[in-house]
Amino acid sequence: VLSEIGTPENSNAPTLIGAAEIENRDVLEDLIKEPKLQLLDLGIIHFDSPDKRGIDVALLYQKKYFRPTSYSNIPLIIYKKEIPKKEKETEVLDEDIEVKKEDNNRVFTRDQLLVSGFLEDEEIHIIVNHWPSRSGGEKATSLFREAAGKLNRRIIDSLQQINPKAKILTMGDFNDGPLNKKIGR
């Protein structure tokens, strides 16, 4: 898709690009040096995440239209339910998601990237997502994506608590369709 920027069919380049499946910052640095993208003067916001495959999310933005003022990576901390429960080691986040205190049962996945800034003169908040995959079966991994959705909702709620009229864009690879319950919440 990025290679089609600047073609007659797609003469307008995006101002903001949420990227998933990013190996490291060097990949992004190489990408923005491509001739068609170099003309856009793109900035990069990227953090290494704890994902077991070593992939991250990032935001590319045209510097002439968007000025970031703050950014942070927000970890999605989820655990498998395979270790036997012990009352002292388990906390219930809600009725379906159980959080264990031990790291040996943690599912290491991508963080959610929160970027705030000004799109021209309007303050905007962008959340770049790459929710856990369906690898291992849709049903078996559904709770992981639901936890990602709940984290995303908490980020949005916290921004709206500060400013009820906040402009928020959440984007990325949700590994679910628009009708799945994780997306609709």
Tell where the protein language model's regions lie, with residue ranges:
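Divalent cation-coordinating acidic motifs and surrounding scaffolds
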Residues: 1-185
